[in-house]
């Protein structure tokens, strides 16, 4: 008999949530990570790393008691527009009778709460090193810190730079846009009123509302040359650049915090169940353009799918047929999202009069067909049929 029903590698939002979901189904779970998250108290300043969670993701995390003491702010509207042309679209929660389209959450606070909830429910090895992985039809064996540990199922949730996938010889294929982005927290003259802003111009600039009404989380996806230039500006000059690029949508940007740069891209593994008893979820399975704001939400959809499948399995967590269906459906969902994001990126990136004309026509069509807009919002909120494709 294996030592565990499941070994989960990666203790971020997706991996820790998966561990808690399986544990509450009375499964024996081992969570392995190369590091331990910082568990210090909350700072006065909002974390640079934020995530926009769909209502479905919020419901899952609340059911696990993971949203306690986690600061968050509702996104009630999303306005998307471009510098040239008139391609503007607004998504409003009121249009579908919802309180919010999403909630912006601090990553560090959420991970800390998830890890606190792991105590006495899940065995955790961190910081630990996985030296070898072997998957067979009978069990999965890992060498962790020179100890041999077995499980009925391996769940890889380590993110885009997964060392476990490298050991298994599995690599993701690039899918469309690649680039770099700058993240920070900014203060503005005007209040955000719960509205997220996304501007297509010199790259893609997003303002996400934070609990303080004149504070926003900033993610600016940029071409390489422009990225290098902006990252070297002093804070005053960078604030001025944000004011200009956002077209003063919230008045002047008066202050910016520490900036972090990070790469982004779209990628997809060939198979979410590439070997017997092995599953790949979250950013380890696929990465999407930050304009989507859906990376973590897709990973939490994976977790809900795993929870659903585990509920129908009796003893053996590694039963092959059920996981094949799960893997095929989750990858299909990922392909739809990747193609949609690539379409938006190319559409808004098209220059010239014909590009603007086509873009404006498409956006006006969406605005005039409530059913299309309604379905787009429901899918983004994790409530549409594609979101439950597992």
Where are these regions (language model features)?
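C-terminal helical "tail/cap" subdomain of flavin- and related membrane-associated enzymes
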Residues: 308-390
């Amino acid at each position: 008999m294996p030592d565990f029903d499941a070994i989960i590698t990666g203790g971020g939002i997706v991996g820790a949530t998966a561990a808690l979901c399986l544990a509450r189904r009375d499964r024996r779970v081992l969570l392995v990570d190369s590091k331990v998250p910082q568990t210090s108290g909350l700072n006065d300043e909002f974390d640079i790393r934020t995530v926009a969670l769909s209502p479905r993701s919020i419901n899952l995390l609340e059911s696990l008691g993971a949203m306690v003491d986690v600061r968050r702010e509702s996104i009630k509207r999303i306005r998307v527009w471009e510098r040239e042309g008139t391609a503007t679209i607004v998504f409003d929660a009121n249009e579908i009778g919802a309180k919010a389209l999403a909630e912006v959450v601090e990553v560090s606070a959420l991970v800390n709460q998830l890890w606190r909830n792991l105590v006495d429910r899940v065995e955790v090895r961190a910081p630990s090193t996985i030296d070898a992985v072997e998957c067979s039809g009978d069990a999965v064996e890992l060498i962790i810190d020179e100890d041999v540990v077995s499980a009925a199922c391996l769940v890889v949730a380590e993110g885009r730079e997964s060392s476990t996938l490298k050991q298994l010889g599995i690599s993701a294929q690039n899918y469309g846009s690649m680039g770099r982005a700058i993240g920070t927290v900014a203060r503005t003259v005007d209040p955000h009123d719960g509205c997220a802003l996304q501007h297509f111009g010199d790259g893609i600039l997003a303002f996400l509302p934070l609990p303080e009404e004149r504070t926003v989380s900033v993610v600016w996806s940029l071409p390489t040359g422009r990225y290098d230039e902006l990252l070297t500006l002093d804070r005053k000059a960078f604030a001025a650049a944000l004011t200009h690029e956002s077209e003063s949508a919230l008045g002047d940007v008066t202050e910016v915090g520490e900036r972090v740069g990070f790469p982004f891209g779209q990628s997809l593994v060939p198979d979410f169940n590439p070997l017997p008893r092995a599953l790949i979820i979250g950013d380890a399975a696929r990465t999407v353009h930050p304009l989507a704001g859906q990376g973590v939400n897709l990973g939490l959809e994976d977790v809900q799918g795993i929870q659903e499948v585990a509920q129908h399995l009796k003893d053996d967590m590694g039963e092959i047929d059920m996981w094949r269906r799960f893997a095929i459906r989750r990858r299909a969902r990922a392909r739809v999202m990747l193609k949609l994001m690539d379409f938006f990126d190319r559409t808004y990136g098209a220059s010239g009069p014909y590009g603007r004309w086509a873009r404006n026509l498409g956006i006006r069509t969406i605005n005039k067909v409530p059913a299309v807009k309604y379905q787009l919002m429901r899918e983004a909120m994790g409530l549409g049929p594609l979101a439950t494709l597992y």
